[in-house]
């Protein structure tokens, strides 16, 4: 994954807005110091980018943060995603299943914690509801089919794509969502839909534009 804040798959924090409307949310948001969140997030990015050594660190970091901020769905979603990734670090079948199931359970809980207050940013410039759903969608779509999460993952991705909140999200986050949608469309054998999302990335000059252009070029050859 790209290392800069503007090019990350999942964007990092901007200032909280609408403070008066978020009186019930600020307690959970402040429960995790931003510096600690960013440190854990950097480890998560490395893990997501293929650094297997960072998976354990990311899982431990976000699990620790979620234990302190038990009602923060964004932190819990990252904890769940990182825990699920730990399934790739062991050859033991029962450990693989344990990590995957524990991570999915955390993601399920994070989704249940979402309220209208999370339409605003929690730890990102992206609305918390979109971030949690996108993290969950990525994980659900990545786990093996026998875990029966693909349908829900596709549904969550669709909810993010169709949300009115997406228009106001950071361009980097939107680009990540469109790129994921394009990849899923390609997997589903729908090249026209994939091209539509890739074209959108390029037209909007999202940070993922170079990657989208490469995919478009590959599809045309």
Walk through the language-model features, giving the residues of each.
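Bacterial N-terminal signal peptides
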Residues: 13-24
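N-terminal leader/linker segments that initiate helical-solenoid repeat arrays
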Residues: 29-65, 78
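Start-of-helix signal in alpha-solenoid helical-repeat scaffolds, especially tetratricopeptide repeats
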Residues: 33-37, 55, 73, 77-80, ...
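Short coil/turn linking the two alpha-helices of tandem helical-hairpin repeats
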Residues: 44-49, 85-94, 118, 139-147, ...
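Helix-turn-helix repeat elements of alpha-solenoid scaffolds
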Residues: 47-63, 96-116, 147-159
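Flexible helix-coil transition and linker loops at the boundaries of alpha-helical arrays
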Residues: 63-75, 108-129, 162-172
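Structural register within alpha-helical repeat arrays
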Residues: 79, 86, 136, 140, ...
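Terminal, low-structured helical/coil segments at or just beyond the last alpha-helical repeat
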Residues: 171-221
